[in-house]
Amino acid sequence: MSGWHHRHILDLAAFSREDYAAVLDLAERFRSLPVTGARKLPALQGRLVATLFFEPSTRTRSSFELAAKRLSADVQSFSPSSSSLSKGESVLDTARTYVAMGADVLVVRHRSTGVPQQLAEDLESAGERTVVLNGGDGLHSHPSQGLLDLHTLARHFAPQHPMPEALQGRRIVIVGDILHSRVARSNLWALTACGADVVLCGPPSLVPDAFRAFVEAPPPGQSADPVPQRGSVRVERRLERALPGADAVMTLRLQKERMTQQLLTGLERYHRDFGLSHERLSLCGQPVPVLHPGPVNRGVEMTGALLDDPSICLVEEQVRNGVPIRMALLYLMAAAESAAESTLVSISS
């Protein structure tokens, strides 16, 4: 892993195809652990991973904690309801407390954009060795979700070699509340960097035209043409125009808790116009998988029948892929050398 250069993982904007390949390759090797009979690796033994989730979470938090434990790390969970935040302690001071306890990795989720980056900058200024992994911040980014979605699609398209090139030239349709979705933004960076063409579909109030130019500007520190054959982004207002020719469809939850004004006329109308069903998917012209980052609102983003159809819906596969992807990220950040490297080599041989 000598080519890995991301000390903190705050978003996917500056990830190269080589970075995506490194994560997916490790995740594939970690997926093989149950097959080999090994439930845990000593890769992060003696390391402390602290999950600082200032927002509710089921999948992401549990997945990160299980990933850390499977790498033999110690895990310390933070709960806002029983913390000193209720006594006026700041987020920064809370994070510093865990650093003082010896945390090697802080996995941070917060409703405000930029909090993980602020913590990373504070740690750098203080000369601390602790690294920050963004578990989701505001509307900005959810890098591990973008990576596990990429992994899920790569495994679907190329199960024998699920690497970034499996997405080259694929058409991925993302439907729903793009405006309030950090998942959508992370998927846009990951999918287009790997050569997929993305179609965003939803009403103007939830999919502003500004998203057409989402990937036109080069990522920070890269040239104007950083990735060969980078994918495109286009916006459609009707599912009937978005779905034909699709290779996969991702639908997103309506994030009513983040909506500051009335952006929808009603859930029934939304489902009528943008809800997925078996019948609607026939417009793709071929069998396609359906993804959703969860939690799913049955009968809104998709029908219950579609959600319960394992031949089409990959929601549970996304959850399964979350653990090896997060194992890969924790490994790359905290133990990309010495004994952990030799452990991985022995597994892959």
From Swiss-Prot:
The keyword Transferase belongs to this UniProt entry's keyword annotation: yes
A GO CC term assigned to this protein in UniProt: cytosol
MF terms in GO: amino acid binding; aspartate carbamoyltransferase activity
Xref: Pfam families: OTCace, OTCace_N
Pathway(s) it belongs to: Pyrimidine metabolism; UMP biosynthesis via de novo pathway; (S)-dihydroorotate from bicarbonate: step 2/3
Tagged with keyword Zinc: no
UniProt EC number: 2.1.3.2
Binding site for L-aspartate: K87, R182, R253
Keywords carried by this UniProt record: Pyrimidine biosynthesis, Transferase
BP GO terms, sorted: 'de novo' pyrimidine nucleobase biosynthetic process; 'de novo' UMP biosynthetic process; amino acid metabolic process
Residue positions binding carbamoyl phosphate: R59, T60, R109, H142, Q145, G294, P295
Catalytic reaction equation(s): carbamoyl phosphate + L-aspartate = N-carbamoyl-L-aspartate + phosphate + H(+)
Family per record: Belongs to the aspartate/ornithine carbamoyltransferase superfamily. ATCase family.
Functional summary from the UniProt entry: Catalyzes the condensation of carbamoyl phosphate and aspartate to form carbamoyl aspartate and inorganic phosphate, the committed step in the de novo pyrimidine nucleotide biosynthesis pathway.
Self-association and partners: Heterododecamer (2C3:3R2) of six catalytic PyrB chains organized as two trimers (C3), and six regulatory PyrI chains organized as three dimers (R2).
Protein name (Swiss-Prot/TrEMBL): Aspartate carbamoyltransferase catalytic subunit
Source species of the chain: Parasynechococcus marenigrum (strain WH8102)
Organism taxonomic ancestry: Bacteria, Bacillati, Cyanobacteriota, Cyanophyceae, Synechococcales
Name of the encoding gene: pyrB
